Amino acid sequence: MDHSETLSTSPITRLRRRAEVLTVSLITAFILCFSVWCLVAPKQTFSENENRALASWPVYSFTALKDGSYMSGVQTYLSDHFPLRDPFMTLKTKYEMLTGREEINDIYLAKDGYYIEAYKTPKQQKKIITQFQKLQDAITTDAKQNVRVMLVPTAISTYNAKLPGSAPDRGVLRQVDTMNEIYAALPNMQKVDAWSALQAAAAQEAGNAGNAQSMAGTEAAGNTRSSGNADGAQPVADAVDAGSDTSDPTGLYYHTDHHWTTHGAYVGYQAYCDAAGLSPIPEADFQKTCVTTDFHGTIFSKLHDSTVPGDTITLYENPANRLTVSYPDTGEVTDTLYNRDYLAQKDKYSMFLNNLHPLVEITNETADSDRQLVLIKDSYANSMVPFLVNHYQKIYVFDTRYYRFGPSSFINEHPEVTDVLLLYNMNTIDTDLGVGGIF
């Protein structure tokens, strides 16, 4: 018998072949089972975690197949409906963190537990300026003299010092430069300087954190001396790191969301009062209520790290207010600025002003004046409205992504309106579709 034939039929060779066949069979079976699972598993139409609609199976046509859009749609569908998608994405994020990455999906892993979105210079700055100016030009009532613009910097500017040292945005305030350019191009509008107010509040916050660390160090040293360690070794003290605990309600921005906190909105409210000649109500005078400690916002959805602790949402309320809040699109009338049903959902920030509506009409019988305000805004304003209602008998809140009739026409039809405020945050103003319809 040929020697090669003997080797090919040896027990070891047969075992190897069986192992190879078994391995291939198992892999094939896994792929088949996984494919069947992908096809028959229940499909969601909306991702609460990402707060967006999931892709549906694309409609086939020869044209779509030819131009590649059909296969692209299939890939998007499979990606959106991949089984155990969220756990796998968390695993991916954790791996990237372990490899030392400090930026994931345009999110900086910043100090004190903050996740901060990178800033992209707006591509439609001229359009923003033009639309703002068109609004004022179209107003024919006395409110024309009281049009104010409030551009709100996000955490990448206010908390710039918290960014990783390797971040290109560290020490570079491009967002503030853009704000100043927009303000300079609108000389006839009154500027609300939210940046200076937030910058001062951030400096105070950092100072308070430093004092807390100093006090903690002093206490630790005192405890060490009193413990009588003969070898002089210093015990490891618990770190006091203001802001690292996401339950801290005194930060200016949420750790896992792009919005400012209620405290941050209060700082913005102070800046508005300064520009509008109003006397702000002291922060201590509001009744504060913590409504959740488990808020995971828009940045959390981009990062996909299910191990991140939730943020705290705190409401500031004035019990003396007598409010009537009307939603013309639904016909709903209520006496509160909040829809607490959203606290049972992931998108908890939507509790402010009941999420998205083209127009909200707010009347306060106990306001300290008979002035009326038209507020044209993005979602940042939703958490500042509870402060503004104290000073205006009536506030008309417009979200021009959905309101299609032009706020300038509304203002001209309501000569009792005394003030107009345009409030937008700098992170989303460039992509906010509502900017195109503000006049």
Task: Go through each PLM region and give its residues.
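Extracellular glycan-modifying ectodomains
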Residues: 1-439
